Amino acid sequence: MTPEHLPTEQYEAQLAEKVVRLQSMMAPFSNLVPEVFRSPVSHYRMRAEFRIWHDGDDLYHIIFDQQTKSRIRVDSFPAASELINQLMSAMIAGVRNNPVLRHKLFQIDYLTTLSNQAVVSLLYHKKLNDEWRQQAEALRDALRAQNLNVHLIGRATKTKIELDQDYIDERLPVAGKEMIYRQVENSFTQPNAAMNIQMLEWALDVTKGSKGDLLELYCGNGNFSLALARNFDRVLATEIAKPSVAAAQYNIAANHIDNVQIIRMAAEEFTQAMNGVREFHRLQGIDLKSYQCETIFVDPPRSGLDSETEKMVQAYPRILYISCNPETLCKNLETLSQTHKVERLALFDQFPYTHHMECGVLLTAK
């Protein structure tokens, strides 16, 4: 695979290999055949980051080869959304002959939605001033004249200039209901929107008929919490990053959801609060003991769950675990399988043509 060519004819073969690999990894814990969710074969990534290479009068996007570290020129990127591809050529055309926008530009980040909105961040090794803002506004207006719904941001050391806003609003059809998700520049969002829809619908399916409340750790912008709210009496969710918490609060209001409570704290702190080890000022007004959480949802970072959180989640009758790293999932399952068994297993092809796998398991108490 090269950045400008996807081996789409090999899509089914690479997916089949992942299914075999996941089944093999899960064999000590389950003999289930994974439910498999396919990605679009191209234009599936909603965000992308490129370094910018200056070559005489020319400049262009590059990425670095992971093995050789050599730079690769990228003029089109079929893994990314069609809007990102349109913007890549439009941004280079708009910056190439503009000394103010071009000077010391070293990276461009793109974030897009299925609803055809974009935030583009230009990163610089220089101070940004009013002249930069004026030139950036002219570029933004020229892009919008081409029917590109785009917001521009300038970044430099300790500097961030938003011309309008630093977010876009995604609209996803999830099990017959449109969900609105605010996505903030430089915060985590699901990279493959089509796959995100399938993940949300799978999570809804496996929690159908749930009793009681849901607890979610690492909720981000509320991606799963808000979609799953319809299956539970109440949802209590934790998140540590301030921009994600703010986006989650916006999303609760935008989706007219009244049974989700977001609290800003780390999973480790929440474990201490639940166990009565510590009291936290930011939990004032929230009666943790009033929640009857029968299900816990975790979507941890690549490192998986730490040992304290492992112990904590074992206290819940049902554990819904979305993993971006099956190796750490299996490590966690060595502990979790002592008290719980795997009821459902899914493979989500979030990153086609790569080694990476995303998967989901539903565990129920033995």
Swiss-Prot record:
- Known catalysed reaction(s)? uridine(54) in tRNA + S-adenosyl-L-methionine = 5-methyluridine(54) in tRNA + S-adenosyl-L-homocysteine + H(+); uridine(341) in tmRNA + S-adenosyl-L-methionine = 5-methyluridine(341) in tmRNA + S-adenosyl-L-homocysteine + H(+)
The record ties this protein, via Pfam families, to:
tRNA_U5-meth_tr
* Class in the EC hierarchy, top level: transferase
- A cellular component annotation (GO) from this entry: cytosol
What keywords tag this UniProt record? Methyltransferase, S-adenosyl-L-methionine, Transferase, tRNA processing
GO molecular-function terms, A-Z: rRNA binding; tRNA (uracil(54)-C5)-methyltransferase activity, S-adenosyl methionine-dependent; tRNA binding
InterPro entries associated with the record: MeTrfase_TrmA_AS, MeTrfase_TrmA_CS, SAM-dependent_MTases_sf, TrmA_MeTrfase, U5_MeTrfase_fam
One GO biological-process annotation of the entry reads: tRNA methylation
Q: Does the keyword 4Fe-4S apply?
A: no
Q: Give residues annotated as binding S-adenosyl-L-methionine.
A: Q190, Y218, N223, E239, D299
Q: Which residues form the active site?
A: C324, E358
E.C. number, please? 2.1.1.-, 2.1.1.35
What PANTHER family does the record point to? TRNA/TMRNA (URACIL-C(5))-METHYLTRANSFERASE, TRNA_TMRNA (URACIL-C(5))-METHYLTRANSFERASE
User: What family does this chain come from, according to its entry?
Assistant: Belongs to the class I-like SAM-binding methyltransferase superfamily. RNA M5U methyltransferase family. TrmA subfamily.
Biological function: Dual-specificity methyltransferase that catalyzes the formation of 5-methyluridine at position 54 (m5U54) in all tRNAs, and that of position 341 (m5U341) in tmRNA (transfer-mRNA).
Protein name, as recorded: tRNA/tmRNA (uracil-C(5))-methyltransferase
Give the originating organism: Escherichia coli O7:K1 (strain IAI39 / ExPEC)
Species lineage:
Bacteria, Pseudomonadati, Pseudomonadota, Gammaproteobacteria, Enterobacterales
